Design a protein with these regions (language model features):
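Periplasm-facing N-terminal accessory domains of Gram-negative outer-membrane beta-barrel systems
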Residues: 2-6, 11-139, 208-210
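Periplasmic N-terminal accessory/gating domains of Gram-negative outer-membrane beta-barrel systems
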Residues: 63, 81, 88-240, 246, ...
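Transmembrane beta-barrel strands of outer-membrane/channel proteins
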Residues: 122, 249-255, 293-297, 378-382, ...
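Solvent-exposed loop/turn elements at secondary-structure boundaries
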Residues: 166, 441-444, 563-595, 600-744, ...
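Hydrophobic, lipid-facing positions within transmembrane beta-strands of outer-membrane proteins
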Residues: 168, 230-232, 274-278, 360-364, ...
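Residue-level signature of outer-membrane beta-barrel architecture
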Residues: 219, 238, 282-284, 368, ...
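Short, solvent-exposed micro-motifs at the edges of structured domains
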Residues: 272, 560, 660-661, 671-690, ...
Length: 985
């Protein structure tokens, strides 16, 4: 059996020798040195690591320099035994290891007989002395004990330096949020299959909190085995069974009776939320075969605040009288419920509307010690989230219906001379998103007049799988890893949008004279696929006992996307004004993506470490959900076409219409040529990163680190709008073409930061962490990402849009704590009922404070991303928190409109030129623990989110055309109370 497995590993490694690295690290590594009492090295010492919870054993032998490396150690608590002739046996117990950790340890031996033994308790280092990477660990204690809304563990990621969590993605060190890598047990767990996100939908983010052992975040100068990613990796490690049965039952509940009133509502909105489930793990065969399973479900019935501009009663009556066909569209809107000026087109509507969210989720994992040197792990996860989200239009809610399946098989082989890890990952998703106005068949009116209501049906499904191999060897002072990966993505998609009409003025609407019409016929069902190939090598070189060098190189090849039936067409020529390309080669492949990594860790003293380095990190473009999905997939039938005012008149298109009615006009080249275009030169996005930090161990349990972190991201997406109508005449430069999007990889993002981290691990009843970051991020688009960014205001002057990125937060502070209240000790340790009453109390919390994000002032025209002029004076108004009017309308002026509804020139105000208000919040939790015997524990806890009920305004209306321009329309939530009961053993 062992011989077969060993030969299989070697064959697999040979097969994959040209593939990329394992993107994420599930295991820990120990770099050890064995010495005698004088400090001289001890050669040929036998080293054994035993997992205290499962009985798993790893063996190696120190070399002539007394050096050894233990690799691929699953997270857990270990006993390390060192034996050498002429010395007493050294036994180090209680060494806690986490995923991705690389620890340097010394094992000094005492002279004596092997029959004698010296036992010590391990002190896991609190500072990193082995590598330059930035680590943020969310361990079991923080996951279980800190307050998390709806048991959402992803909110704890922002407790790390340089991490900003937004819209289910993570911006690491200012880099594009879809440039990170999200994995569970090392295998891809991206929810949508289109971009890296922390979830496809719902509260359960890829895996239940109950199943999580720890979450490891690696960024900065990560080793070459981390990739492909341009910013970093979030890896969730799930729990496994042990030799003891352990499990839990929990109930999480929220009701409106204990919640504060939303600041924009007159009464508390009804709310019923229940989250429930449990776990069970243990041995099937002691020391050999283990299992762990989790079920979690939630049912949410709540009222969400919906707000926006809606047509006034007088305006809609006037339009319907002139154009009766608009009655169905205006009937989808409620009437304003706030005061508005006589003759106004729109008024403001705000109310509470019913929302619904359900999910059922389960996860099963088994771990099998095949032999003393071979470990096999298998995990499977599935969930069925559903979501109903209300919007301003009661007739147009959005629903999601999703099915997700994820699995991973992991195999570890270890020996004295080499070790290896093999992983197979699988991810299958099905998603249907429906805007209900689509079902009504109503043509939409969007844009300039201050109100919009449109709808789409999107069906999306796909699969991605990967196979990875990593081999580790120890050669003197060199610990070498090399590995490979093959990962294939496939995605099918079908989507269609209702016709969208834009009218520049009220007079145009009354005359049914559309300024612009966008028809999205939808993409015929298709299957896109691409793959990643490459390899890496990593050498951790112990130059001296005080200096470690991390030398790495990885190569990545990202294939050009293809369509299963060769139905993918791109155009060539200057900015896409040319013939179609080969469907199997929509842009030029790049074969030279080499990414060097260089890091160092220098222990100036045993308690002071200087770390730093430089590296290149490469990602794939977000093809699915990005530009590729919009590329025309039929030569005779576009998926989207945009008609100018003159073109609409030429073809006789007026409100309303249907996609089916317009299709004959453009099918077979009968109308303007449409379709999105991707530049032939479309290199992969990458970042250049550099760091320098100083870390100090304050006590055995406390540390402080201060770091400078910088990076420069290159080749993220920019989209230009090509063949727009002339700003004055309203004519297109190339009349035979429609307006279309042109994607090129020319975005640049720069980030500089000073990051400071304080950590105190749990000791004497107290755990604490604090992070302060000063940072500045600059980009050229208002959605700097790898998928669908916003176009620049001026297509031919993208550099004029240089400004703060949308996730530029200048000052950011977080602190978290867990404190076991010493009430029983202060009361003299009472017995019986007194101990039951006073013992087991704890308090925990998270304090967040940050300055406001950038906000972008816009003007609605046929030129997307248009901005108005700044005409002087303060853009902000005083007493905004009392009046709710934050921006000063008189400081801005609309740019006059020319031909075809286009502004006659770009507006003068810069992109993201203004700032929103800052944010601060304190979440608290108070818990009482009841202990029954040695193993059973019941925790009853109350979580208070926004415990002080501080109003943090958000939702600023930034469109100059809006009647509510500059007003706050929402908050980031009033106080909520969540009750949780959890029984564990």
């Amino acid at each position: 059996m062992r011989s077969f497995l060993n030969h299989g590993l070697i064959a697999l490694a040979s097969t994959l020798c040209s593939l990329p690295v394992a993107a994420q690290v599930n295991t820990a590594t120990i770099f050890g040195t064995v010495t005698d009492p004088s400090g001289a090295s001890v050669a040929q010492a036998e080293v054994t690591a035993t997992n205290e919870q499962t009985g798993g054993v790893w063996n190696t032998t120190a070399d002539a320099a007394g050096e050894f490396t233990l690799t691929f150690l699953p997270p857990g608590r270990y006993t390390i035994v060192v034996r050498a002739a002429g010395f007493k046996e050294k036994r180090t117990t209680g060494l806690e290891l986490v995923a991705g950790q690389r620890v340097r340890l010394r094992f000094p031996l005492e002279l004596g007989q092997l029959t004698e033994s010296v036992t010590v308790t391990a002190e896991t280092p609190v500072i990193n002395t082995a590598s330059a990477q930035q680590d943020h660990l969310v361990a079991t204690l923080r996951i279980q004990e800190l307050p998390t809304m709806n048991r959402d563990w992803t909110t704890l990621l922002q407790l790390g330096a340089g991490l900003v969590v937004s819209n289910n993605a993570v911006a690491m060190n200012g880099l594009p949020p879809d440039g990170f890598r999200f994995t569970v047990d090392g295998a891809s767990a991206s929810g949508s299959g289109e971009s890296e996100t922390l979830t496809s939908l719902g509260y359960i983010k890829a895996v239940s909190l109950e199943a999580i052992r720890e979450v490891s975040v690696v960024s900065g100068i990560a080793p070459a085995e981390t990739g492909p990613t341009m910013s970093g990796n979030v890896n969730v490690i799930t729990k496994s069974g042990t030799n003891e049965f352990h499990g839990s039952l929990f109930e999480n509940n929220r009701v409106e009776d204990f919640a504060a009133r939303n600041q924009f509502l007159t009464s508390r909105a009804p709310l019923t939320f229940n989250q429930f489930g449990g776990s069970l793990g243990g041995p099937i065969v002691r020391n050999k075969l283990f299992f762990f399973g989790v079920y979690e479900g939630y049912r949410s019935r709540a009222f969400a605040v919906v707000s926006g501009n809606v047509p006034t009663k007088e305006f809609r009556e006037m339009v319907i009288a002139a154009q009766p066909a608009t009655k169905a569209f205006f009937g989808t809107f409620p009437l304003p419920n706030t005061t508005y000026s006589p003759g106004a087109v729109t008024g403001f509507y705000q109310s509470a509307a019913s929302s619904k969210e359900d999910n059922d989720h389960y996860s099963v994992r088994t771990d099998y010690s095949l032999t003393d040197t071979d470990l096999l792990s298998v995990r499977f996860t599935q969930d069925w989230p559903f979501q109903f989200t209300p919007r301003v239009s009661p007739a147009n809610p959005r629903t999601f219906d999703v099915k997700d399946k994820k699995g991973v098989v992991n195999y570890i082989h270890s020996s004295a001379s080499w070790s290896a890890e093999t992983r197979y990952g699988y991810n299958r998703f099905e998603r249907v998103r429906l805007d209900h106005i689509y079902s009504l068949g109503v043509s939409a009116i969007v844009g300039n007049l201050g109100f919009s209501n449109s709808g789409e049906l999107m069906e999306n499904l796909g699969t991605n799988f990967s196979i990875e191999e990593v081999i580790a060897q120890h050669r003197g002072r060199h610990s070498i890893k090399y590995g490979a990966l093959y990962q294939k993505y496939s995605s099918g998609r079908n989507n269609e949008t209702v016709p969208e009409f834009r009218f520049a003025t009220v007079a145009d609407l009354l005359a049914n004279r559309p300024t612009q019409i966008t028809i999205s016929f939808g993409v015929r069902p298709y299957t896109l696929y691409n793959w990643i190939l490459g390899y890496f090598v990593q050498d951790d070189y112990r130059v001296t006992d005080r200096l470690m060098l991390n030398l790495g190189l990885r190569y990545d090849y990202f294939s050009v996307p293809k369509e299963k039936n060769k139905r993918l067409f791109n155009r060539t020529g200057p900015f896409g004004i040319g013939p179609y390309t080969d469907p199997d080669s929509i842009y030029d492949a790049n074969y030279l993506d080499l990414s060097p990594r260089l890091g160092f860790a220098w222990s100036a003293t045993p308690k002071l470490v200087v770390r730093g380095g430089f590296g290149k990190f490469t990602s794939s473009h977000n093809h699915f959900g990005g530009p590729v999905e919009l590329v025309q997939n039929a030569l005779d039938e576009p998926n989207r076409v945009v008609f100018s005012q003159l073109e609409a008149q030429r073809y006789g298109i007026t409100y309303p219409t249907t996609n089916a009615a317009v299709l004959p006009l453009v099918k077979g080249g009968g109308g303007p040529i449409a379709g999105t275009v991707i530049s032939r030169h479309f290199p992969q996005p990458y970042s250049l990163q550099w760091t320098l930090s100083v870390a100090r161990q304050i006590t055995p349990d406390m540390s402080f680190e201060s770091a400078y972190v910088g990076n420069h991201a290159v080749h993220a997406n920019i989209v230009r709008k090509i063949n727009q109508v002339d700003r004055i005449t309203g004519l297109r430069p190339f009349p035979e073409y429609s307006e279309f999007r042109y994607y090129e990889a020319s975005e640049s993002v720069r980030y500089n930061a000073w990051q400071n981290t304080f950590r105190r691990r749990f000791a004497a009843g107290l755990q604490m962490g604090a992070v302060y970051t000063w940072a500045h991020t600059i980009s050229y688009t208002n959605a700097a990402n790898l998928g669908l960014p916003n176009p620049p205001q001026d297509t031919w002057n993208t550099r004029a849009d240089k400004g703060p990125s949308p996730f530029d937060i200048r000052h950011h502070f977080h602190t978290d704590f867990l404190y076991e209240l010493p009430l029983a000790r202060l009361a003299g340790r009472p017995a019986g009922g007194g101990r039951l009453l006073l013992g087991g109390w704890q308090v925990s919390g998270i304090l967040t404070a940050e300055t406001g994000p950038a906000i972008n002032i816009t003007q609605s025209t046929t030129y997307e991303s248009s901005r108005p002029d700044y005409v002087g004076g303060s853009p902000y108004l005083p007493d905004a928190e009392s009046t709710l009017q934050y921006l000063n309308r008189s400081a801005f002026a609309k740019v006059p409109i020319g031909g075809g509804g286009a502004p006659i020139r770009p507006g003068s105000i810069g992109r993201n030129a203004l700032r929103a208000l800052g944010y601060w919040n304190l979440d608290l939790a108070l818990a009482k623990n009841f202990q029954f015997g040695e193993r059973w524990r019941l925790q009853v806890r109350g979580d208070l989110f926004n415990s002080l009920n501080h109003t943090n305004f958000s939702g600023i209306s930034t469109g100059i055309d809006s009647a509510n321009f500059g007003r706050f329309t929402s908050t980031r939530g009033a106080r909520l109370v969540q009750f949780n009961a959890r029984l564990s053993f």
